[in-house]
Design a protein with these regions (language model features):
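A hydrophobic, multi-pass inner-membrane permease signature
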Residues: 1-242
Length: 242
């Protein structure tokens, strides 16, 4: 039985590596055949054109990585701080209107405002267009699910007696939050941080929407989409000519 389990796990592990191998094989394939025939386990025509193109564009790619790392770091830390502060307030039973506020957060999970209203707010009122903040601010409170997770964790995992004892000793709400609540909430905050970091790292749409005149602020995902479109267009043009 254990041998069968090992065989199944080995098979699944090899299966999980297949997409990575296909990407590596495609990177060494001639662009014309890659566009025409798709992915192959072994390149039909070997070529280093893709890597030569990357080396030629290395300054732009390196800058895009730096922008993405900066946006991911600032956005993740800011998201954790905002979500945890909001969730901590909503977890307090004596907060006036907490049910209404929490209901509005749940409402945003069910109904989206759409791209056009968001664009009008961030462009016309916050003036984030063509700035690096256009890559950070739109995702700060985009996911109400994280607020629900952290709020429930605060209510279920942190005994109110601890904060009450600190209040008796004269501690204020912010002191209690940063000295008691945050250290005890490392597991859920790490989970939320990972989710937010992946969101910021994989985001490419905000670059298209808010950086129409500042391509030097493109993140790596937006830049890769642009490069991929250019490569596919050139490859298709060469294939049609041949």
């Amino acid at each position: 039985m254990q041998l069968l389990a090992h065989i199944v796990m080995i098979f699944l592990s090899v299966l999980a590596l297949v997409p990575f191998w296909l990407l590596i094989a495609a990177s060494f394939s001639d662009s014309n055949y890659a566009v025409a025939e798709g992915y192959r386990f072994i390149p039909k025509v070997f070529s280093l054109d893709a890597y030569q193109y990357i080396l030629q564009q290395w300054n732009q790619i390196g800058r895009a990585y730096l922008v993405t790392l900066t946006v991911t770091a600032v956005g993740t830390v800011s998201s954790i701080l905002i979500v945890s502060l909001l969730s901590y307030g909503l977890s307090q039973k004596d907060l006036p209107g907490r049910r209404v506020i929490f209901g509005l957060i749940l409402f945003t999970m069910l109904f989206s405002g759409g791209i056009v209203p968001q664009y009008m707010i961030y462009n016309n009122y916050l003036h984030l267009k063509n700035t690096i903040w256009g890559l950070i601010v739109p995702n700060l409170l985009l996911n109400g699910f994280t607020v629900v997770l952290v709020r429930n964790y605060f209510q279920q995992s942190i005994p109110p007696e601890l904060s009450e004892a600190m209040e008796i000793d004269g501690a204020g709400p912010f002191y209690i939050f940063f000295r008691l609540v945050m250290p005890l909430s490392t597991p859920i905050l790490a989970t939320v941080g990972l989710m937010e970091a992946v969101t910021y790292w994989n985001d490419w749409n905000n670059g298209y929407v808010y950086l129409s005149k500042r391509r030097d602020l493109y993140g790596i995902q937006t830049l890769l989409n642009v490069l991929n479109q250019n490569i596919q267009a050139l490859a298709q043009q060469d294939f049609d000519m041949n």
